[in-house]
Amino acid sequence: MFNGSLVALVTPMQENGEIDYSNLKELVEWHLENDTDGLVILGTTGESPTITAEERHKIIRQVVDQVNKKIPIIVGTGANSTVHTIEMTQQAMELGADAALIVTPYYNKPTQEGLFQYFKTIAEAVPIAQILYNVPSRTACDLLPETVIRIAKCSNVVGLKEATGDIQRVKQLKAEDLDLLSGDDKTAMDFMLAGGKGVISVVANVVPKPYHAFCITAVSGNVELAKKENDQLSPLYDSLFVESNPIPVKWALSQMGVIPKGIRLPLTPLSERYHAKVRESLQQVGIKC
């Protein structure tokens, strides 16, 4: 159902922090024209913690209407409140999204049983397709494979975004009826070659067409070509993470003329000492800026 290059889309903002809805429309069109396989909106890269309820509604509605079922739209709906997560997941479904991406609760530090009950409760409350999201580096909470297997018994839990970079987890879970998606660009090739279906990618923001081709190659199991394409993209794997995501990728896109320069506090624009490194990596992958 969900596979290939699924871009973790940035939310374009003006320098005063206001969302640029006109530019968002242009950005979505750019991805449609450049073979992106799906859009993941209002996730980590989309600065979801700083987006208001009114803005969420407007963003989801605009993107759903524009895409018009050409490619899947996945909306980040996770929070550390079960009730709030259910509300946002319900909203995504009502506005026409294809799936919800639900991160493990952050700050609360639930047990594995707590995680099971949390995801089971949401799955039973809202019938939209749901993708679990495990990113312990941000949440201080690790969704273990044995817990994923329990949650996967819910019929509308259809996938897992695994951002630990642990390839063994793919091998443990590939027998399950789940779309396994990497959430870590640096290890995405090995993830897909081990049985993953695709990537929810930060890097795909700046190189959508090459990243789509790379995902097709890796998912098909063409090891030699996948390594070649991965090497071509590799300058971005470090440079786009020199500071907290999405700081570097938004700066890169602004340098490319794709989006304005805005980002919301507590995130700040890319530190000047990293400008040359990010610019050089863009040039290494053939982007003029």
Curated annotation (Swiss-Prot):
UniProt keyword annotation of Lyase present: yes
Swiss-Prot/TrEMBL catalytic activity: L-aspartate 4-semialdehyde + pyruvate = (2S,4S)-4-hydroxy-2,3,4,5-tetrahydrodipicolinate + H2O + H(+)
Subcellular location: Cytoplasm
Subunit structure: Homotetramer; dimer of dimers.
Protein name: 4-hydroxy-tetrahydrodipicolinate synthase
The encoding gene: dapA
Pathway(s) per entry: Amino-acid biosynthesis; L-lysine biosynthesis via DAP pathway; (S)-tetrahydrodipicolinate from L-aspartate: step 3/4
GO CC terms, sorted: cytosol
GO MF annotation: an example: 4-hydroxy-tetrahydrodipicolinate synthase activity
GO biological process: diaminopimelate biosynthetic process; lysine biosynthetic process via diaminopimelate
Organism: Coxiella burnetii (strain RSA 493 / Nine Mile phase I)
InterPro entries given in the database record: Aldolase_TIM, DapA, DapA-like, Schiff_base-form_aldolases_AS, Schiff_base-form_aldolases_CS
Positions of transmembrane segments: none
